[in-house]
Amino acid sequence: MGLDGLAAYLDAYLENIVREGKSEHTVAAYRRDLQELLALLEEMPSANPSNCTRGDFVQALRRLSGRGLGERTLARKLSSWRQYCVWLVKRGLMHADPTADIKPPKQPERVPKALPQEWLNRMLDLPVDGGDPLAVRDHALFELMYGSGLRVSEIHGLNADDVYLDEAWVHVIGKGRKQRQVPLVGKSVEALKNYLPLRQTASDGKALFTGRNGTRLSQRQIQKRLAQWAAQNGDGRHVSPHMMRHSYAGHLLQASRDIRAVQELLGHSSLSTTQIYTKLDFDHIARLYDEAHPRAKRQDE
């Protein structure tokens, strides 16, 4: 298949992955990667313009590498190209996948950053102004981040009826529209019970976390509120939703030693994604948890 063919089926491919449940961000990333590929192939002289070969894709990857792109970025772009080619082959539109044996750049293993257990407990146990609905909301939001390890996109998408306080669990729609049930620790249940009576009614009638005007908090707003909270009350360290999730995963894995259970709780489709947390080494942890999560303990214990 040549450049014209690759361009002709691009929209159909993107429509297909939308139907498969890929998020808007994922679809947009695929679109950028594939449009960039088409532009690279168009720039390059080819011995056979009607048939893009393995060498053409290798050359495109080298050009991106020459622009200073990192190994992880290059590997992601190659993955986008490969998934498109596989889709074309499965539908009989391409004879063979020209990217099949192209090796992605070797990626350095990177251990996720996590926060010390004692620091998180101290921060989350700070007094909350019960007369300030936004402070109560934020406290519930942060307890949920660490207590259940949700992605910022998952917290953003939560509806009020996704939370079952009596049963202490939350219904989560994760990547690829995959659904899972995640337990709520005692501190999260307590914080949500304090927040729900003060919650600004959602303009869509559904959103769990809303702003003053009732609109659903955006992912960016959630990130900003967390960063501001940490800056105002902490020791100046940067805190992100990813770090809260990594802390949840690492602390829980160290306490439970059950990597399969942690995989399910995090919503990882592959165990290899979860295994990176086995390499976390927290200097600030003096002992393992008495329970699977420290926030599960009630105040009177």
UniProtKB/Swiss-Prot annotation:
Keywords: Cell cycle, Cell division, Chromosome partition, Cytoplasm, DNA integration, DNA recombination, DNA-binding. GO terms for cellular component: cytoplasm; Holliday junction resolvase complex. This is Tyrosine recombinase XerC. PANTHER family: PHAGE INTEGRASE-RELATED, TYROSINE RECOMBINASE XERC. The active site is at R151, K175, H242, R245, H268, Y277 (o-(3'-phospho-dna)-tyrosine intermediate). Its main location: cytoplasm. GO terms for biological process: cell division; chromosome segregation; DNA recombination; DNA transposition; resolution of DNA recombination intermediates.
